Amino acid sequence: MSSTIFYRFKSQRNTSRILFDGTGLTVFDLKREIIQENKLGDGTDFQLKIYNPDTEEEYDDDAFVIPRSTSVIVKRSPAIKSFSVHSRLKGNVGAAALGNATRYVTGRPRVLQKRQHTATTTANVSGTTEEERIASMFATQENQWEQTQEEMSAATPVFFKSQTNKNSAQENEGPPPPGYMCYRCGGRDHWIKNCPTNSDPNFEGKRIRRTTGIPKKFLKSIEIDPETMTPEEMAQRKIMITDEGKFVVQVEDKQSWEDYQRKRENRQIDGDETIWRKGHFKDLPDDLKCPLTGGLLRQPVKTSKCCNIDFSKEALENALVESDFVCPNCETRDILLDSLVPDQDKEKEVETFLKKQEELHGSSKDGNQPETKKMKLMDPTGTAGLNNNTSLPTSVNNGGTPVPPVPLPFGIPPFPMFPMPFMPPTATITNPHQADASPKK
């Protein structure tokens, strides 16, 4: 019959168990079984600790045998790493990692080094006072420090040189890679630390702008020679440089400009929405006025279940939704949107009112037009001065009142004739009264 040891992670609530044969299991074997069962990995990045749930005492001895039917608490914490000079030189990072759970995965128990105790004289503490014991403690520490200094003086010093400075120095040696540019002078044949202008205190950099934050679709490549251009010319042409070392200029965003123009046109089209606002029409009848908006009724609807008053459709729907379907006029509840009935007769009255307003508005505009413009509108063909002998109806008679147009006689085209090469062109009479005042032949 197999034995069982119950365990539970400190951050969990459920309890698991490990099955084994025997009366007990060592701490080393228990940790290895827990790591394998929970698939915790190779153990290089954490350390596993086991505690007694009653006394919260850690089982730190791997050889300690835990009896069967025992419950333990398991805690996983980050590994403690300590790098030494020898581990860096050898390149063995795993050997430098201390305090992890690797040995439980590989099956190698922990090997403890024997500490070399220095020969110290232990004074007989029996029968001594507290001051004598303190003095003896300080004397022991001084002896240990002197022995440590003697060992350090005989040890061979090991010097470690950082590899980062060496690599960075080697990277900037030799010719620069393709695409590199010195941002001080604009040259591409040297590193910026080797720029010949570093020793010139009067040198002013070209101040080449970079394209940070600008999308590539708004950049256009150009070919220039930075050695032959002054900083003022580059700033005037707004030349920038990319990460690849290419010179570019910024182009306009046509798409955004077109979108702006389109939105502007839409706003102008939406200007017709002002006819539904309050105060747009000064002579608006009360029966065509919306009780909610105070303006002209727009898509008039009625509340069939209560007061049966006309409202604008959109305004009434918004008011019902915001007030939990309560009529804004008579405060009747449960007025649903499906109960709204369109008022066709009222909509026709609204259309008739708008047509009258358009006619009045159009007539007021026509009344402000000059007399010459009215004549051109009434006689767009320009046939008033084709022939002096031809009596054509004019748009304005001697009294100044307009007369209805009369059909032209048969054979006369409705447009002015072009002069023939063998006949001189006739003078165009702009004033219709001149035709009456001219002498008849």
Curated annotation (Swiss-Prot):
Positions of region (Disordered): 355-400
Q: Where are the zinc fingers (CCHC-type)?
A: 180-197
Residues where Phosphoserine occurs?
A: 221
Q: Where is the DWNN domain?
A: 5-78
Q: Name one GO cellular component term.
A: cytosol
In which residue ranges is the amino acid composition biased (Basic and acidic residues)? 355-364
User: Is Zinc a UniProt keyword of this protein?
Assistant: yes
Keyword Chaperone carried by entry: no
The note filed under miscellaneous reads: Present with 1130 molecules/cell in log phase SD medium.
This chain's protein is named Protein MPE1
